[in-house]
């Protein structure tokens, strides 16, 4: 039956070409979004999904000039011929990096910023600010400064700041990118709650499909190479192969069902692991696959490389960021460090690298006490890649940034050039070697910082959120590269919120909570332990839920067998 409602967003034969580019980024877009809908816009990096969003909120063409053809109407406004100020009254945008959206010195000031600009009377402004803060659950933090908030709290403030204008459209740009799994889950729940209370139209730009589908969406719009490839209900899209063909990871439980030979159709409602239809034959197929799939071979215990003994640290006398932490990481291991924001994970890496000095405890590297080793000497053996690439980058050009750490190393200019170019190739940056870093996306900048550390051939690499901002293809490229380094003997430690990464690439994980090490187990075992998941603010894998639904025990063995099988399938290029 044809749609009779009037769309709140309507693209008709719409194309957009940035002024600095020779070809359009968006080609002949035809898309209608209706009031009150919740739509996920998915696509790999560079697909055009962010450009599509920027046309809706007015960043294109008003902040980033370009040529528009066709028509785009947003809440009755001719968007390309309007203004960014006018569109801001219709579309509220929550950015990927909430720090980039903060303006006020306190939460209250930040939320009230738009009201101040419109000269709202003070009493009315206070009341609107209070209501917006209550709506997003941040009403008890109105006097807090931005640096006193967690990542999830900052995102709530950003959301409240756009809600004060009573916009009809909310646009979320990768809302899960910088959040721990539990907070990401809460963010999706918050978006769901806000939409139900306000009947706002919600657009979510995200490639972490399974995490977004924690709550229902009406449609998924798949974008690649500047074109809309699909506009389907989740059950329809998950039943086909379009996601995999376009570099978007389907939910793990869906992949497991495919491996077991289950025919996935829209009638099975595959959009949610709790409600996917599994008849007796499907359940038996999954059990038979589990019985037939061999367990990955156990590896011998490695020789210790990094030993941490009784480590404690606080940024002030009455604040204990880390308390009595002890563990050993062996040569050639690949280990993940997980836990909620503020659990002490990044602080631990700073202590290992020498950026901070522990209050008590010892750190040994290859049997040597590091207490007398300064940052520079430690950096010869231990490489560290920060979560925010902008905090590491100091050069204008990509090649110069990667080469910086080799200056004064005794290598000739030719040797430096060869090593830098080799590293850029394996990081997928060689075509951009002469580009300015300012022209790169957040994810591309991340790869530059990884390259700048890898070029120095460290024995141990610590990476803080190595795949943040990466689509599935680039995620796989980086992780396979790191796994290749690991296979050559380089020890890799990753601080991560990505449960897929934890499962796929790190046989062992260290889980932290409130500055304490609460688990040192296999990644699969941790993600199949509900109590531990809650304590460490993780998110149980959907494979655990699927195993339980099929009566497969122990669930962690099902998870381990799936990960081993999936790696083999992807290695074969299937």
Q: For the regions a protein language model found, what residue spans apply to each?
A:
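Helix-to-loop junction immediately C-terminal to a conserved catalytic motif
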Residues: 57, 353
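Conserved ABC ATPase signature
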Residues: 145-149, 153, 436-440
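Conserved beta-strand-loop-alpha-helix hinge in the C-terminal portion
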Residues: 227-253, 516-543
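Conserved ABC ATPase "signature" region
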Residues: 123-141, 414-432
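Catalytic Walker B motif of ABC-type/P-loop ATPase nucleotide-binding domains
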Residues: 170-173, 461-464
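Conserved ABC transporter NBD signature motif
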Residues: 65-77, 361-369, 378
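The feature captures the beta-strand-to-loop junction immediately N-terminal to the Walker
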Residues: 42-44, 338-340
